[in-house]
């Protein structure tokens, strides 16, 4: 057993007491991102090493792996703790998203180590989608690069409000305060272009040497701020969903016998209590909450993020994908929306194409009406394009086959986040964040049906010699 873990269990008074203490710790999900070879995997390895989360057999294996694949000479290559794929170890880069778990006396953590290469943008977006904080690594020798800007933009696009700019490899610039100050000013100048009210913090460190990672550095007396671990342990996460209105997407209708009918799911935002009047969308039927059933028994109220089963006073028609919200809230269903899209497939996203989409348990079909622009994620400029390529990010107009209840992604990631699914292969080909739902009054009517538009796109793609015109060419 890990000696540090054994000591923690002893201090808590046994395994059972230790497990109870773990359950009551807050959880922080964060990701590390930055340019290639900025030291992301090394930083995570250092956090695991310095918080004594590595077992003795892992440490022994790390010594052997460092001799075979290491890039740090005689020193331990801590990056190998995270780079698990054979291709990653041989190339010395991160390809896939690697998740690691550790805890301290104050908090539990889930780390997503995301790739820095531009061709793995889709992997980074996947890792960022569930995180609350992003650590942006910058090589002190190189300063703010295009990839730094790209990762910052993707993080904020996916709703991350807390950014920790870790200026790494300070040991290679002689722990220069001037270098730290210059990079800090450069990043703040760029950050003015990022959307939202962001919490940005700066920490100078050396992941290889351990300076300012888990303990204060003696080599940088000019820095009096917290270490990276102290920032992670003390940052107060802004949970946007707590302040938002109630949203309860139904994931499953639970009917184990004739006497019980409940609607299971995770409360996406707000709170719900017994006796509350609720409305079911898109039908608009109303009822009252009779019971809130959980694994630990009935509750009088529940809050955002909790998995619950709601029992209503009336027997009404509710199925998977329906949405429950407060009865006095007017939230219209829409059939069109502008959506920020991260495209993840080799086949580009083009106007006229149709895809299956899933959003908050609901599955339907959507047609691409047009592409407003693609974002150049290296300098955040916008340019007109005919299609959205692999790893491209852009603003797209969608029309759905049926009315949907949507929120803006920045307000509610559950009811504002969707995925695109290829209808033939059933593969996820893109991720979308609702930029703005379009009400029926403002949606432009189409003179063509969804079938006609899809057939037109099919003919133009496979039979270009027929010379068929683009029915959406005016968009």
Swiss-Prot record:
| Pathway(s) the chain acts in | Sulfur metabolism; hydrogen sulfide biosynthesis; sulfite from sulfate: step 1/3
Give the Enzyme Commission number. Answer: 2.7.7.4
Q: Positions of the region G4?
A: 168-171
Q: Which residues of the sequence carry a binding annotation for GTP?
A: 34-41, 113-117, 168-171
Give the region (G3) as residue ranges. 113-116
List the Gene3D superfamilies.
P-loop containing nucleotide triphosphate hydrolases (3.40.50.300), Translation factors (2.40.30.10)
Region listing for G2, in residue ranges: 92-96
Where is the stretch described as G1? Answer: 34-41
Q: Which keywords does the record carry?
A: ATP-binding, GTP-binding, Nucleotide-binding, Nucleotidyltransferase, Transferase
Any one Gene Ontology molecular-function term assigned to this protein's record: ATP binding
Question: Which terms does the UniProt entry file under GO BP?
Answer: hydrogen sulfide biosynthetic process; sulfate assimilation
Look up the domain of life of the source: Bacteria
SUPFAM superfamilies to which the protein is assigned, alphabetical:
EF-Tu/eEF-1alpha/eIF2-gamma C-terminal domain, P-loop containing nucleoside triphosphate hydrolases, Translation proteins
Q: Which InterPro entries match?
A: CysN_GTP-bd (IPR041757), CysN_II (IPR044138), CysN_NoDQ_III (IPR044139), G_TR_CS (IPR031157), GTP-eEF1A_C (IPR054696), P-loop_NTPase (IPR027417), Small_GTP-bd (IPR005225), SO4_adenylTrfase_lsu (IPR011779)
Kindly indicate whether the keyword Nucleotide-binding belongs to this entry. Answer: yes
Q: Which reaction does it catalyse?
A: sulfate + ATP + H(+) = adenosine 5'-phosphosulfate + diphosphate
Pfam families the record matches? GTP-eEF1A_C, GTP_EFTU
The tr-type G domain is annotated at: 25-239
CDD domains reported in the protein's UniProt record: CysN_ATPS, CysN_NodQ_II, CysN_NoDQ_III
Q: Which PANTHER family match?
A: TRANSLATION FACTOR
Quaternary structure and partners: Heterodimer composed of CysD, the smaller subunit, and CysN.
**Described purpose of this protein according to its UniProt entry:** With CysD forms the ATP sulfurylase (ATPS) that catalyzes the adenylation of sulfate producing adenosine 5'-phosphosulfate (APS) and diphosphate, the first enzymatic step in sulfur assimilation pathway. APS synthesis involves the formation of a high-energy phosphoric-sulfuric acid anhydride bond driven by GTP hydrolysis by CysN coupled to ATP hydrolysis by CysD.
Write out the similarity annotation.
Answer: Belongs to the TRAFAC class translation factor GTPase superfamily. Classic translation factor GTPase family. CysN/NodQ subfamily.
- The protein's name in its UniProt record: Sulfate adenylyltransferase subunit 1
What species was this sequence derived from?
Answer: Escherichia coli O1:K1 / APEC
């Amino acid at each position: 057993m890990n000696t540090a873990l054994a000591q923690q269990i002893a201090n808590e008074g046994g395994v059972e007491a230790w497990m109870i203490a773990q359950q009551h710790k807050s959880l922080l999900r964060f990701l590390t991102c930055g340019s290639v070879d900025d030291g992301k995997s090394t930083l995570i390895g250092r956090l695991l090493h310095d918080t004594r989360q590595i077992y003795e057999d892992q440490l022994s294996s790390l010594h052997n792996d460092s001799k075979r694949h290491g890039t740090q000479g005689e020193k331990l290559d801590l990056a190998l703790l995270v780079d698990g794929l054979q291709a990653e170890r041989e190339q010395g880069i991160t390809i896939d998203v690697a998740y690691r778990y550790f805890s301290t006396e104050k908090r539990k953590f889930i780390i997503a180590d995301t790739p820095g290469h531009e061709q793995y943008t889709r992997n980074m977006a996947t890792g960022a989608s569930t995180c609350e904080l992003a650590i942006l690594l910058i090589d002190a020798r190189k300063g703010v690069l295009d990839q730094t800007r790209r990762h910052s933009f993707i993080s904020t696009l996916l709703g991350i409000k807390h950014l920790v700019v870790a200026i790494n490899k300070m040991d290679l610039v002689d722990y220069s305060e001037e270098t730290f100050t210059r990079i800090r000013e450069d990043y703040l100048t760029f950050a003015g272009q990022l959307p939202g009210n962001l919490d940005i913090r700066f920490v100078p460190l050396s992941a290889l040497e351990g300076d300012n990672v888990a303990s204060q550095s003696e080599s940088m007396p000019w820095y009096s701020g917290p270490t990276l671990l102290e920032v992670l342990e003390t940052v107060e996460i802004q949970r946007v969903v707590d302040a938002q209105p109630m949203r309860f997407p139904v994931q499953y209708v639970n009917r184990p016998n004739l006497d019980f009918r409940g609607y299971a799911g995770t409360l996406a935002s707000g709170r719900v209590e017994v006796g509350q009047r609720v409305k079911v969308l898109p039908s608009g039927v109303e009822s009252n909450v009779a019971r809130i059933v959980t694994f630990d028994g009935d509750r009088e109220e529940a809050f955002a993020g909790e998995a619950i089963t709601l029992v209503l006073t009336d027997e009404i028609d509710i199925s998977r994908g329906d949405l429950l919200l407060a009865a006095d809230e007017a939230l219209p269903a829409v059939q069109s929306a502008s959506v920020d899209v991260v495209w993840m497939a080799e086949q580009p996203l083009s106007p006229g194409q149709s895809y299956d989409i899933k959003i908050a348990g609901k599955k339907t079909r959507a047609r691409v009406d047009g592409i407003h622009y693609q974002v150049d994620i290296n300098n955040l400029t916008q340019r007109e394009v005919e299609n959205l390529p692999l790893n491209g990010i852009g603003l797209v107009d969608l029309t759905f086959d049926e009315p949907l209840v949507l929120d803006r992604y920045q307000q509610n990631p559950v009811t504002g986040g969707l995925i695109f699914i290829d209808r033939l292969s059933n593969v996820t080909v893109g991720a979308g964040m609702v930029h703005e739902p379009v009400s029926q009054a403002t949606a432009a009517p189409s003179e063509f049906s969804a079938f006609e538009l899809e057939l037109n796109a099919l003919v133009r793609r496979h039979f270009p010699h027929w010379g068929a015109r683009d029915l959406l060419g005016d968009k």
